[in-house]
């Protein structure tokens, strides 16, 4: 009711904005002034922010009206959306399965038609994984394209905010609304292209050179996901693109990512160590304490590895226009499991390792769009991430639109919402 009242009060004013009063859902890790924002934690169950995040301010300045908050795992840690405050977000296509995370609430809300636009955040696939599992579209942009914060970790570019929508066309509109230059974000920069929406078809008649991988040569991967990736590659070849098995070397990616992620968690959430540990999810505590134990030599090594990966990824893009990989190594899993423990013959001893096919891409600062390309045996969507060189969101969106058009599944909706 409050959102509708806001729209009615500002009808004339909103008509001159980009979003014209369209409702927008905000992930519950992001502050909205005067709106309960819990971060998925009992500790913040009654938290009312005094100010909004830059993402929200940008949305509202472009005519978006905040409709509500979407569910997350506690402190957005993990790729399965559940917490002790609001319970578990179910996959709209199969209610016994996970919607992914940590932007699972946003993805599920979009899939069920609650809104056209929702925000997500992505550290290690938190936006991409749920998008592909719920049959929607999500973009992890080049760091700095969308201003965010202020936060304790404003100078880190590992976690970014990004748009989520039901299809690529809507995604391009929402990206236009989110992009801005704001000095409050030290990584923010002025984009050098026009409207992503107006230019959405500017590469639609082009043929591209594409590298692809099912596993980067190192990650385990479920057979259903491997088959889906192969079938997507066949589709791209039928569309006239040149596709080869080639990809940057990610052998050391997990070592770097785990260290940098732990440092980020300790920097952002060290204060939680003074709280009652019974109120904090085990995985969150593990990540914070891992960061607490880091020394400068480990951080130095992590940065060196990341720099090497970045340079080798740019070398890859000297030869190829895009890189394609699965957005997740498994289809959506059982709702009652906290995280994936085993794939093929690999056993994971922490909640991060199974996400590394997305996490390794985060290290590159490259934009990546997740899109569903098929359905698993249990009836839930599965899909790929399409990765472009830094700052090439326009080209990336245009290319992914051609894939979406060829697949012709973006207008499908889960039967459960009826």
Regions found by a protein language model. Name each.
Residues 6-9, 189-196, 303-311, 350-351:
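Short gly/ser/thr-rich secondary-structure transition/capping motifs
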């Amino acid at each position: 009711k409050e959102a509708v009242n806001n729209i009615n009060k500002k009808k004339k004013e909103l008509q001159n904005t980009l979003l014209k009063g369209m409702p927008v859902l905000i992930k519950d890790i992001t502050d909205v002034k005067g709106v309960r924002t819990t971060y998925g934690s009992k500790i913040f169950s009654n938290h009312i922010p005094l100010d909004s995040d830059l993402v929200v301010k940008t949305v509202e300045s472009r005519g978006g009206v905040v409709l509500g908050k979407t569910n997350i795992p506690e402190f957005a840690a993990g790729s399965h959306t559940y917490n002790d405050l609001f319970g578990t977000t179910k996959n709209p296509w199969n209610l016994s399965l996970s919607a992914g995370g940590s932007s699972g609430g946003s993805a599920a809300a979009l899939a069920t038609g609650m809104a056209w636009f929702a925000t997500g955040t992505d550290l290690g696939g938190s936006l991409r994984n749920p998008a592909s599992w719920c049959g929607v579209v999500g973009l992890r942009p080049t760091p700095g394209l969308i201003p965010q914060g202020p936060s304790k970790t404003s100078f880190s570019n590992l976690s970014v905010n990004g748009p989520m929508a039901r299809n690529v066309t809507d995604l391009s509109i929402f990206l236009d609304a989110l992009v801005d230059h704001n000095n409050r974000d030290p990584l923010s920069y002025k984009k050098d292209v026009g409207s992503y929406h107006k230019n959405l078809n500017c590469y639609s008649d082009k043929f591209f050179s594409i590298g692809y991988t099912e596993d980067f040569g190192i990650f385990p991967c479920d057979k259903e996901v491997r088959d889906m990736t192969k079938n997507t590659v066949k589709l791209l070849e039928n569309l006239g693109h040149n596709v080869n098995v080639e990809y940057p070397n990610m052998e050391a990616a997990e070592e770097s990512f785990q260290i940098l992620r732990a440092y980020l968690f300790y920097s952002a959430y060290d204060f939680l160590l003074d709280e009652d540990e019974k109120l904090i999810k085990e995985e969150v505590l593990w990540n914070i304490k891992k960061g607490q134990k880091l020394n400068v030599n480990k951080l130095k090594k992590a940065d060196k590895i990341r720099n090497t990966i970045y340079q080798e990824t740019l070398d890859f893009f000297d030869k190829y226009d895009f890189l394609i990989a699965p957005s997740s190594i498994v289809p959506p899993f059982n709702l009652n499991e906290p995280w994936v423990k085993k794939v093929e013959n690999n056993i994971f001893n922490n909640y991060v390792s199974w996400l590394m096919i997305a996490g390794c891409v985060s290290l590159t600062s490259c934009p990546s769009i997740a899109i569903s390309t098929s359905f698993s045996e249990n009836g839930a969507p599965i899909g790929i991430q399409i990765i472009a060189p830094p700052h090439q969101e326009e080209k990336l969106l245009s290319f992914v639109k051609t894939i979406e058009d060829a697949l012709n599944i973006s207008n499908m909706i889960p039967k459960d919402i009826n």
